[in-house]
Amino acid sequence: MKSSEIRQKFLQFFQSKGHTIVPSSSLVPANDPTLLFTNSGMVQFKDVFTGKEARAYKRATSSQRSVRAGGKHNDLENVGYTARHHTFFEMLGNFSFGDYFKREAIQYAWELLTQVYRLPAEKLWVTVYQEDDEAYDIWAKEVGVPAERIIRIGDNKGARYASDNFWQMADTGPCGPCSEIFYDHGPEIWGGPPGSLEEDGDRYIEIWNLVFMQFERDAAGNMERLPKPCVDTGMGLERIAAVLQHVHSNYEIDLFQKLIAAAARETGVKDLADNSLKVIADHIRACAFLIVDGIIPSNEGRGYVLRRIVRRALRHGYKLGQTKPFFHRLVPDLVAEMGEAYPELAQVAERVAQVLRQEEKRFGETLEHGMKILDGALAKVAKGDPLDGTTLFTLYDTYGFPVDLTADICRERGVEVDMAGFEAAMQRQREQARAAGKFKMAEGLSYEGAETRFEGYESLELSGVKVTALYVEGTQVEQVSAGQDAVVVLDATPFYAESGGQVGDTGLLEAGGVRFAVADTLKIQPGVFGHHGTLEAGALKVGDTLLARVDAVRRARTVRNHSATHLMHKALREVLGAHVQQRGSLVDPDKTRFDFAHDAPMTAEQIARVEAIVNAEVLANQATEAKVMAYDDAVKGGAMALFGEKYGDTVRVLDIGFSRELCGGTHVRRTGDIGLFKVVSEGGVAAGVRRIEAITGDNALAWVQDQNVLLQRAAGVLRAPAHELPERIAQVQEQLKALEKELEQARTKLAASAGNDLAATATVEVKGIKVLAASIGDVDPKALRGMVDNLKDRLKPAVVLLAAGSADGKISLVGGVTADLTGRIKAGDLVGFVAGQVGGKGGGRPDMAMGGGTDLAALPAAVASVQKWVDERL
């Protein structure tokens, strides 16, 4: 059975059991700072399990793209060396949100494995938590698994509920026992059943984990039963495929065999069992899907993990003898294997290959040199000693070698690495990274009240709003006094809280003698708006009723920029291509700053086309329309979902002109309200990411007027109409070039004339050699050199030293020696001798040298010393 069939049968089976098939979520967890990458099927349902989010369904099934590389869950160093470790894998799962529980979960799993996949029942073993009699009885009495193949696993990790068969999301929160299903490969494979001393062998392989969330654990460790227990299951596609295809290693399944063959093709390797081919085949999956989800190789965060994986693959290619770019050529093979299941891969395949090709080129420039440095360092390491941290850091900092890549190479050579030394060298960078990753001060404030009702789509002023919480310096208080900075939470507000790149509103909260100036609005928790500012007058208490008034002018400017951003995004995709995806944005009253995926600078023509498209939509003055609908319906209707944003089952869809996006921000009523759109800058911010800044409305008008003033001034200076300025400037440039050429010719003639005079008046003879040393005023260094060349030809055999002092106090020196004398006198030595006396340095060839200095007062004596210096050397 092919891997694609296994995946399809799994989803179809659970769909037949009333489950909704939910597409794989992004590898970038939405709004979850605790995870670097999505690493299991339950990640996208985390808020559903904890009760923070409701879905339209209670049963779900998915095939979730997952990555374990970096952070707590990191399999990177084992990939390629074991049968079952991967950076990228697919997790098949079924989930119940307070619907069915253990009985159905166990029965569904058994039915799928034995009736759909037709695995022999006698090959399946199960484990249950030691105290989970309910699960044990279902397996034994209802499913009919013999007692000898049901194993109870207790608290085997040193603490209460610390067990391979007890799962918990965190130290507190939902948790519960789990039941794992194992497949017995048979006695010809070494290993024992789970819980035995030989459990680490490959005979008994876990293929499915059924988690039963039935408790809520508090900070004291107390367990309370959940009123609506849930089910979370996970089965690795690669593992079940190995079982169904009768192989013992995941790398032997059909999907990997085709990728390994492709890697062998691109590296010229004949031995398909080579571990390096396994590494490359695994890594192309992780790298491609990370790029699909918007991650670009970089030196921080998720981008750095991607860079590490790419470079590890390239290093293994280099190890196989492939020193030219090859990794990106595996993308079509990956699309052939996985593009049907994940159409998002096929849609951006060209972009994926392009990003990988650029990273290959970037690393290829340093790989060979870095390997020489590493090989040299390893050759000096004494037996039993580690590679020092300084070398590790040099390879990382100078040659782009991720430290785990270096450690990987060292492991192959039997050498440990000095991680402590490396960490010491990295301390400053780590501190900077930690500082950059901190939350804003307002986020995460303790709050247990109702969410804030947002009324700001329709109104900028709202009376009768009630204060539900107050905070001063992060501490919840009952009252705020005049002059204090504070955060105010209201039951309802017209103030927009910063989200989706749009800045928060400012304005006033007032009542009687109370006046609170709102400087910013942020969400302190999902759905809870914190109004940051200063109490300018009065005393403010929890429970007070206020009038909330948004700064209307500032909001109007902000919404113009936000609506223009939507139109610009659509226009960029039309002009540059569908690969353009938002990578970040900032929308404030002054501008819109938009980061997007694109690999080359935009041309002036492309920018002009974007401006024309957006302004055409503005002039059309179409009404904007916002609708609330189901997420699936919105996407089917063509709404664009933005990278990195988290969406619930119900979303707000904004139609503005020819653009349709999911957006919770505030916008203009009609496109004409934008007034005018103008791009003011375009540039790169990272590899594969460009940034546009644009302005709208009165800001755009003021910018155009300022440009017009500058244009008119330039026209006045050049005495030409504005529309003729390009031609007039070109004429002036040509005239300038001609004048510069004439000036150069005049200088040359003047220098020749001066040289003739010098030859006649300043030359002395020393032991049959003509010596000329003179200072000739302010002469261009280039002309000075020409004079020395002419004098050498005229006086030979000769030694010539000319000096020129400029008006700004700089001295230029040029020395020349005819070829027949360079065996005894070097021009470089001569110039160095003179330059040292005037506070400078000099040097050059034996026959011609240049130098300089700054001490004009010492120049006459320095020039006069040349004759004696030459005499001493002849």
Swiss-Prot record:
Domain of life: Bacteria
Single GO cellular component term: cytosol
EC numbers on record: 6.1.1.7
InterPro entries found in the cross-reference section: aa-tRNA-synth_II/BPL/LPL, Ala-tRNA-lgiase_IIc, Ala-tRNA-ligase_IIc_anticod-bd, Ala-tRNA-synth_IIc_core, Ala-tRNA-synth_IIc_N, Ala-tRNA_ligase, Ala_tRNA_ligase_euk/bac, DHHA1_dom
Binding note for cofactor: Binds 1 zinc ion per subunit.
PROSITE patterns: AA_TRNA_LIGASE_II_ALA (PS50860)
Subcellular location: Cytoplasm
Binding site for Zn(2+): H562, H566, C663, H667
Cofactor(s), names only, from the UniProt record: Zn(2+)
UniProt KW keywords: Aminoacyl-tRNA synthetase, ATP-binding, Cytoplasm, Ligase, Metal-binding, Nucleotide-binding, Protein biosynthesis, RNA-binding, tRNA-binding, Zinc
Catalysed transformations (reactions): tRNA(Ala) + L-alanine + ATP = L-alanyl-tRNA(Ala) + AMP + diphosphate
A biological-process GO annotation: negative regulation of DNA-templated transcription
Function: Catalyzes the attachment of alanine to tRNA(Ala) in a two-step reaction: alanine is first activated by ATP to form Ala-AMP and then transferred to the acceptor end of tRNA(Ala). Also edits incorrectly charged Ser-tRNA(Ala) and Gly-tRNA(Ala) via its editing domain.
Domain remark text: Consists of three domains; the N-terminal catalytic domain, the editing domain and the C-terminal C-Ala domain. The editing domain removes incorrectly charged amino acids, while the C-Ala domain, along with tRNA(Ala), serves as a bridge to cooperatively bring together the editing and aminoacylation centers thus stimulating deacylation of misacylated tRNAs.
UniProt family annotation: Belongs to the class-II aminoacyl-tRNA synthetase family.
HAMAP family the UniProt entry points to: Ala_tRNA_synth_B (MF_00036_B)
PANTHER family, per the entry: ALANINE--TRNA LIGASE, CYTOPLASMIC (PTHR11777:SF9), ALANYL-TRNA SYNTHETASE (PTHR11777)
Name of the protein: Alanine--tRNA ligase
Origin species: Bordetella parapertussis (strain 12822 / ATCC BAA-587 / NCTC 13253)
Organism ancestry: Bacteria, Pseudomonadati, Pseudomonadota, Betaproteobacteria, Burkholderiales
Gene from which the chain derives: alaS
